[in-house]
Amino acid sequence: MADPLEIRPTAGSLGAEVSGLSADRLDESAARQLMEALATHLVLFLPGLAPTVEQFRDIGALFGELEVHPYIPNVDEQFPEVVELDSEVSPKADLWHTDVTFSESPPIAALLHMVEGPEFGGDTMWINALDVYDTLSDPLKVMLEGLTCTHNDTRGALTAEHPIVRVQPGTGRKGLFVNKQFSRRIPQLSRPESQMLLAHLFRWQEQVKFSCRWRWSVGDVVIWDERFTLHSVVDDTKERRLLHRATVLGDLASLAVPDAPVWPAYERNTMASSGYYGIGGYEF
């Protein structure tokens, strides 16, 4: 049996640094320890691991089936699951977000490998959505458990609806599932109610106390749980960032709160002027 990995938390809310892992010696024990650590810490930092493309693919496959992206270029035709993210080609993701929540089954996890990066700057930050939910008031928690939110991509071509509160498998902890980049509307509420509530949730979850931050070095690998975190790049450098990425596909298993109330979609009264035109500048 391989020696146990050393798991050292890096922040109070989430994140842990992993040492003792070799990219060319991935066994069942190491895989089990990584999966357990990810469930606990949500983000794992593997400094200086420097895997080959094949090794990086194999690490990702420990967590489930990997996505073959339809249009982001892959690094190697032999390993189509590994795509290339180049800051000189694609825009930096400097808004707090969870990836592709406009999908019917958003990803379970994601991995990044820093291939080329600046000497300093260009850090990445993550937020713990479980801690975010825990700190909400009890009345608001009760209200949120019966609500959903529609998410769409920036072009509006893809749309999905998800519960605002999700349950973490294995622990039963609840997490908030909205993000500023893709979350658009709470259909059970009027438009102004939805706008005000989402604005509050966005502000609440972006508090620094819920976050961790990683200063990249070439060769670093980061793995994170996409279901209960948000992330954002710190856009403070113009130097190139070249990363390899792998994404663990989601499944259709429901993470909704069991027995949560079900509310119908809000219907505005178009037979009344206030409902048709809105009042006070609001569109209902």
Regions from the PLM with identified roles:
Residues A2-V221, E226-F284:
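Non-heme Fe(II) oxygenase catalytic core, chiefly the N-lobe of the double-stranded beta-helix
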